[in-house]
Amino acid sequence: MAALIADTGGLLRALAARPDGSATWPEYAKALMDASAVIVPALVLAEVDYFLGKNRSAMRKLVAEILDPHTTYELEHALPGDLARALEFDAKFAKLELGLVDGTVAAVAERRSVHRILTTDRRDFGALRIGVRFHRALTLLP
């Protein structure tokens, strides 16, 4: 088991459930369950809130789980250096049009040395490279 960083789409899919309670995207849910730590950047949490829209109960449940010290979730606030690095990623990989949230996911991955990303955005995170020389690829889950 290794830690992962949850991107917006990956987290939304991992949490999606059918009316009977079973996972809509079981491979995403399994990646969350198998992780030693699920790092959720605060900007990702804000984006998840936006996409959940009127599903307030789902957001309340997610926040409660993130704040529960007995879960594997870790809320990761963006440091000033993360925001600056996110803008560097956005400029370096301009054709991807990463934006601040995806750039911050990459910056947190780089700072925390956690290279496993739970995401639906294979195009951007598959092309992105982190590290001082932009040499390190990310491992995309599931």
Task: Show the residue positions of the predicted features.
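Short, well-structured N-terminal submotif of metal-dependent ribonuclease cores
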Residues: M1-V40, L52-A64, G131
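Histidine- and aromatic-rich ligand-binding microenvironments
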Residues: L4-D7, V40-P41, L98-L100, D121, ...
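Active-site neighborhoods of divalent-metal-dependent phosphate/nucleic-acid chemistry enzymes
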Residues: E74-T120
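Acidic, PIN/NYN-like endoribonuclease modules and their adjacent C-terminal/linker elements
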Residues: M1, R111-P142
